[in-house]
Amino acid sequence: MPPACRFTREQIVAAALAITRERGFDAVTARAVADTLHSSSKVIFSAFSGMDDLLAATIDAADAQYRAYSADFVRDSADPPYKAVGTAYIRFARNEPNLFHLLYMRDRRREDHSGDAENIAVLVDFLMAKLSLTREDATLLHIEMWAYVHRNAVDVRPHFDVGVRPRHCGAVRVRAAELGRRAHQPDADGRV
């Protein structure tokens, strides 16, 4: 009978997350995790079906860290919630560049994106309620604001190539104001 594993799945994922945070996701190997735990790589395979299983759990743990970071920031911020979410995203990129890269800059073309639509719908509904926008205008505003916020988040990460600068995003602010004004103009029946 094989000996019981001395490390829990959570401890192994925490080691993989620490490696990601320090050296990037590509540095997460069976050997690196084992070295971090001062153990052999066999402990990983007694708790996980393989490296892909561990890597998926590491991505989930990084996502949970971002969600907790964002929720704490929004709760403690004096800014309106929508702005605070964007600010939290940018600060997370600056404070946790390797986790940010893992979550938001890896190739996700082969991944399931079904949860993304639900997250976006919550924000679009919020914008519709707060700014009296149509779903189409709120979606457009959110996409434009997300592009602006994501570009700023990419820029603030340490080791960013300073030769690449974002375009002036005043157009996004103008578009948001334009959509907001249009939402408050009376329609043909005089309703706002």
Regions found by a protein language model. Name each.
Residues 90-111, 119, 152-162:
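Amphipathic alpha-helical segments used for helix-helix packing
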